[in-house]
Curated annotation (Swiss-Prot):
Belongs to the G-protein coupled receptor 1 family. The chain crosses the membrane at residues 34-54, 63-83, 108-128, 148-168, 204-224, 245-265, 281-301. It comes from the Eukaryota. The lineage of its organism: Eukaryota, Metazoa, Chordata, Craniata, Vertebrata. It holds the Pfam family 7tm_4. Keywords: Cell membrane, Disulfide bond, G-protein coupled receptor, Glycoprotein, Membrane, Olfaction, Receptor, Sensory transduction, Transducer, Transmembrane, Transmembrane helix. This is Olfactory receptor 51S1. Residues 1-33, 84-107, 169-203, 266-280 are extracellular. Odorant receptor. SUPFAM superfamilies: Family A G protein-coupled receptor-like (SSF81321). The gene is OR51S1. It is a multi-pass membrane protein.
Amino acid sequence: MSTLPTQIAPNSSTSMAPTFLLVGMPGLSGAPSWWTLPLIAVYLLSALGNGTILWIIALQPALHRPMHFFLFLLSVSDIGLVTALMPTLLGIALAGAHTVPASACLLQMVFIHVFSVMESSVLLAMSIDRALAICRPLHYPALLTNGVISKISLAISFRCLGLHLPLPFLLAYMPYCLPQVLTHSYCLHPDVARLACPEAWGAAYSLFVVLSAMGLDPLLIFFSYGLIGKVLQGVESREDRWKAGQTCAAHLSAVLLFYIPMILLALINHPELPITQHTHTLLSYVHFLLPPLINPILYSVKMKEIRKRILNRLQPRKVGGAQ
């Protein structure tokens, strides 16, 4: 059974210990059977749903367009994110393994944040795509060429990897003033960084990384939707407004699904608020696990091209010359 790391004496610091203790949802490790199957089901359904989206887009040349390319990247980020979460989640559920080596913890942290920021970046790119398609329909093909999309993809890759690869090295050499006990069932950067001493110089860079992605992206996304709303107000035909709005429905739902739990987590993450650890941890699970599960359903239902091709693939093919 895992034990708490040794307490650090007041006014003293130490280097990173060889292990971290993951607390997660209190009480779950004592009765893992009832939440192991839902965890496995969430992972398998997320992988199946996003894998289907990847398969359909890759095999259909008609879907090799900007919006579908960004949807392809979104499914990649969803599969990567849910896969990065599973090792420690299933370790706690199946074996009560709350202790994780520091190196494995930092590696998991990098993958979680790389794919999380990738998802945020792709959602931003998709909002720009929708804004251009609705606000500048005549110029849309000339604005979002294959070359521009390639540059956007490179920018997303640099943003995800360039910003987050230095984090484990910074955290590994920062002085720590608190025991290495993490509040979640997986390793997150804010959870690790809060254990460092206040004067640690890497904290400023860590704050910059968080704000540059998760703080900036939702503002730009909602600015894009402000432009879309302004254009739609000038459309006289109610039917045309409805059609234009429907092209944004799946994306806007995905945006709200991703950012609302994250914003709530930021708002309740204050020691003076009477929020239980169960509530905080459950909201974290919703933020990380629900989008990969729901996004494929949203896009399959709301996007006619995706839905039609999935149904065509599922229908049995007629044999011979049967009509």
